[in-house]
């Protein structure tokens, strides 16, 4: 029972709250964020394959607008855009709304990372479970997890970086050798963290 209640909560939390991410409308800056992503993607394709795709949207400060989250959400896009709840929309609207689910799934993942951080610090499984439930149900974070393609991904990756920092610190305190994989992980996720919110 010590862990069962947490996973029962998590199951219903994903099912029920996940639906709200589909029902949340598009905010005022999501189209801009999406267009910056498309232009940056075109820029990469132009560089790699000598193409001449449109990158005009990056004029001015647009190219410094972080797009790291979209690398992650692109993996889910082909599947999420086919959900029946999105069938009435055009393809671009489907893609933007599908990112809401990607944000929400990343938020749930951040909850699991949060639980691991608590266990690293306190080593009390029940306390970690309850803390994670309160974290996931915190109204401000939960509300933003339905649509915010900037702050929630940044928070989630920041927690992952924090987990690896604490893990490495604990190993060093115990005078043990830190495995190279931890440095690779924290380097990768720190780079991703900076790419999500470069400025603003």
Stretches with model-predicted labels:
Residues 27-28, 146-154:
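Short acidic/glycine- and proline-prone juxtamembrane loop motifs at membrane-interface regions
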Residues 33-35, 39, 107, 154-162:
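Hydrophobic core segments of transmembrane alpha-helices in multi-pass, intramembrane catalytic enzymes
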Residues 161-182:
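Membrane-interface transmembrane helices that cradle and orient dolichyl/undecaprenyl
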Residues 97-122, 160-164:
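Transmembrane-helix motifs of polytopic, lipid-linked glycan transferases
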Residues 71-102, 124, 139-140:
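Juxtamembrane segments of multi-pass membrane glycosylation machinery
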Residues 131-136, 143, 163, 190, ...:
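Short helix- or helix-capping micro-motifs
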Residues 15-19, 31-69, 75-88:
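Extracytosolic helix-loop segments that constitute the early lumenal/periplasmic catalytic or substrate-binding loops
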Residues 7, 83-89, 109, 114-137, ...:
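Transmembrane-helix signature of polytopic, membrane-embedded enzymes
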């Amino acid at each position: 029972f010590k862990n069962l209640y947490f996973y029962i909560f998590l199951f219903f939390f994903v099912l029920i709250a996940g639906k709200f991410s589909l029902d949340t409308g598009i905010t005022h800056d999501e189209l801009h964020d999406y267009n910056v992503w498309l232009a940056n993607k075109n820029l990469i394709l132009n560089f790699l394959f000598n193409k001449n795709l449109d990158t005009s949207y990056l004029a001015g400060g647009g190219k410094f607008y972080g797009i790291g989250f979209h690398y992650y959400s692109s993996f889910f896009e082909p599947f999420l855009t086919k959900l029946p709840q999105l069938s009435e929309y055009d393809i671009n609207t489907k893609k933007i709304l599908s990112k809401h689910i990607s944000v929400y799934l990343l938020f749930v993942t951040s909850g699991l990372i949060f639980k691991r951080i608590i266990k690293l610090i306190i080593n009390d499984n029940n306390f970690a479970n309850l803390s994670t439930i309160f974290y996931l149900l915190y109204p401000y974070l939960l509300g933003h997890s339905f649509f915010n393609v900037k702050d929630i991904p940044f928070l989630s990756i920041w927690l992952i970086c924090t987990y690896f920092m604490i893990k490495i610190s604990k190993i060093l305190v115990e005078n043990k050798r830190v495995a190279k994989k931890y440095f690779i992980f924290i380097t990768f996720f720190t780079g991703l963290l900076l790419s999500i919110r470069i400025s603003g």
